[in-house]
Every structure is written in structure tokens, then in C-alpha cells.
Design a protein with these regions (language model features):
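Non-catalytic, solvent-exposed segments at the cell envelope interface
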Residues: 2-350
């Protein structure tokens, strides 16, 4: 090989070396950026979640806790996947705090109450679930509840169920539910107006079928009988309407809420979120941004663990019922638990 050929070869080797070095640096930069982005996303979603230490506040004077057996975690970032039956109190808060909630809630309210209350029972195999709606107009004996500021609330007789949240927050809501059901709430999940609307929008809307016309000027919802694809604001209005259907009571509205829950489960099942990181982030961000949980679910890894344990749960495997009730003798606009049917229902969830 001549001197000229040697020089040309050295130049080619040098160029290849520079190209490989640039490619390596680019790849390394992309990897660092990807890891940093993933880390930021995890931190952001994790920091969205607000929590309340309900177990510490209520202590040991509670119904017995169901035994669960954790299985191996699916990944290092996820908590062990639990098995065994599970009872979760899910509340929809009518808080008007924040611009979005005030706009979606309509009007003004000096305090928040539980606008929707559901006890979600997941069976031991995590393949079936029963959702029991508790009418917010139910008259109950509200127990004394500890306050975060110190002291406690007084026992209240013939109190509306949804006042438990307004006087004592999540802790009192859980204690009241456990008092009237005799069932230990393993977890607590609360979502507000804005969070519900964002979730529906992140999923691309939700499809529902109404069996009658709905005309509610208060919620600005007007739907003809039939099938509709609703955006977040419309779905929230449907969940909250009570004057546009039936006799205007909370019982008619509960039926719509239960229909929406099953429709949302169906909508979620149409998305393969694990293979669509962008959609997964949108949905997770929408949920966690307006979420309050107990400390047992206050991290993304714990929520992922719960999600993995029920990933085989379909809308068809979910039964929705309302706590058996009758008109309250003291007030025709209120209801009380119908016995022994209500006690029998709660017993079946233990």
C-alpha cells in the first residue's frame, strides 16, 4: 500500500471513528433524556396524589381487617400484588375549591360533602366486584370522629350520611361507613369534579345509553332517550343530575352513576394502556391530579399494584346495587336502611 493509500485509509478510519463517537454520544444523550423524562413523569404523577392517614386516626376500634396475601411484585418499581377480598370506599367530592371544580360544580359552596359514595367490594380472586351505592340522603347515626386539629366531633342522630365528610373529612366518612355497615374499609379513594371530567376526556369520552329523556337546567344537561358519547363535562353533569329524571330524588341519580361506572370500565378496556405510553400518562395524570387516598395507596407503585391485581376484572363481572332502603318515617325526603336486607348485604361483603 502506497503512502497516499495509507493516508486515505487513515482518513476513512478517522471519519468512521468520529461518526461512531457522535452516534454513541447521541444515543447516550437520548438514553439520559429518556431516563430523566421517565423519572420526572414518575415523580410528577407520584406528587399529584394527596393522602390521609386514616388508619392512624381511627386506631384499632374498627371492624376486623380481611387477610390478604401479597404475591411477587411485577417489577422493582411496583409494590407486591395483593390477593384476597378488598373493600374500598370511593367518594366523589362536591368540593368547589379550585377554579375547575367551582366552574364544573356550579354555584358556590362554603363546604364540601360526599356527592357520591360507593363501597367497592372485590372478591378474593380479584375477578368479580360488587359496587354498593349509599344514598347521600340516608339518615344515619354519625359517630364521634377524631379531628386533625384535635378533639372530636359529637355523635349525631338522624344525620344525613353525606354530612360525615363535611364535618370530619375522609376519616369521618370512613368511620361512618364502617359504623353503619360493620365492614372494614381497606382503602379510601376520593376524586373531585375536575378529576372525573379529566379522566373521561383522557379516555376519549364515554358512551352511555339512557332509557328516558333527561332535561336538567341546573346541570345544563339535555339528552334525548338513546345512546350518547359524552365528554368529561357532560358525563359529570349526568352523574350529578337529579332534577332531570324520575322524581328528582338521589335514588334516580344513583342509577345513572352506576351506569357511568360500568361504561367507564368498558371504555378503559378498549385502550391497551400498557402499549400506549402517551395515553397511559394522560389517563394516569388525569386520575392522580385530583385524587386523595389513604396512606396505603398514596404512591404510584401502590396504585399500579392495585391495578395489576384487578386487571382481569371486566364490566360484565361488576354488579351494581343500592343499599336497601325505605322512606324515613321522620322525613319523606330522606331514606333509612331497610332491615334486615341492608345488614344481609353488608354481611355478604365481609
Amino acid at each position: 500500500m502506497t503512502d497516499t493509500e495509507n493516508v486515505d485509509e487513515d482518513r476513512r478510519v478517522g471519519r468512521r471513528s468520529r461518526v461512531l463517537k457522535i452516534a454513541g454520544l447521541t444515543l447516550a444523550g437520548a438514553l439520559v433524556l429518556g431516563v430523566a423524562t421517565a423519572g420526572w413523569a414518575y415523580w410528577h404523577l407520584n406528587s399529584n396524589i394527596k393522602s390521609v392517614d386514616i388508619d392512624s386516626a381511627l386506631g384499632t376500634d374498627r371492624p376486623a381487617k380481611a387477610v390478604t396475601t401479597p404475591s411477587a411484585a411485577a417489577s422493582a418499581s411496583a409494590a407486591p400484588v395483593p390477593t384476597g377480598s378488598l373493600n374500598i370506599l370511593v367518594l366523589g367530592s362536591d368540593s368547589r375549591s379550585g377554579k375547575e371544580n367551582k366552574a364544573l360544580g356550579g354555584g358556590d359552596s362554603s363546604g364540601a360533602r360526599s356527592d357520591t359514595a360507593m363501597v367497592v367490594h372485590i372478591d378474593a380472586g380479584r375477578k368479580k366486584a360488587t359496587i354498593v351505592s349509599i344514598p347521600r340522603d340516608t339518615l344515619v347515626t354519625r359517630p364521634s370522629c377524631p379531628l386533625s386539629s384535635g378533639g372530636s366531633t359529637s355523635v349525631a342522630y338522624n344525620a344525613m350520611f353525606n354530612t360525615a365528610y363535611s364535618v370530619g373529612g375522609p376519616v369521618c366518612a370512613v368511620k361512618t361507613v364502617e359504623s353503619i355497615t360493620g365492614v372494614r374499609m381497606d382503602h379510601y379513594i376520593e376524586i373531585d369534579f375536575a378529576g372525573f371530567a379529566k379522566l373521561v376526556n383522557a379516555l376519549g369520552g364515554v358512551t352511555v345509553t339512557t332509557t328516558q329523556d333527561i332535561d336538567d337546567d341546573d346541570s345544563h344537561l339535555h339528552l334525548k332517550k338513546g345512546t350518547h358519547h359524552l365528554n368529561g363535562k357532560q358525563a359529570l353533569a349526568l352523574a350529578r343530575t337529579r332534577h332531570g329524571i324520575g322524581d328528582g330524588s338521589d335514588l334516580g341519580r344513583i342509577g345513572l352513576q352506576q351506569m357511568l361506572v360500568k361504561a367507564l370500565l368498558t371504555q378503559i378496556s378498549t385502550h391497551d394502556l400498557l402499549t400506549d405510553p402517551t395515553k397511559l400518562y394522560e389517563v394516569t395524570d388525569a386520575v392522580t391530579d385530583s385524587l386523595t387516598t389513604d396512606t396505603g395507596l398514596d404512591s404510584l407503585s401502590e396504585l399500579i399494584s392495585l391495578g395489576q391485581s384487578v386487571k382481569g376484572l371486566s364490566a360484565d363481572a361488576v354488579t351494581t346495587v343500592t343499599m336497601p332502603n325505605v322512606t324515613a318515617p321522620s322525613d319523606p325526603n330522606r331514606v333509612v336502611a331497610k332491615e334486615p336486607a341492608a345488614s344481609d348485604l353488608w354481611e355478604s361483603l365481609r
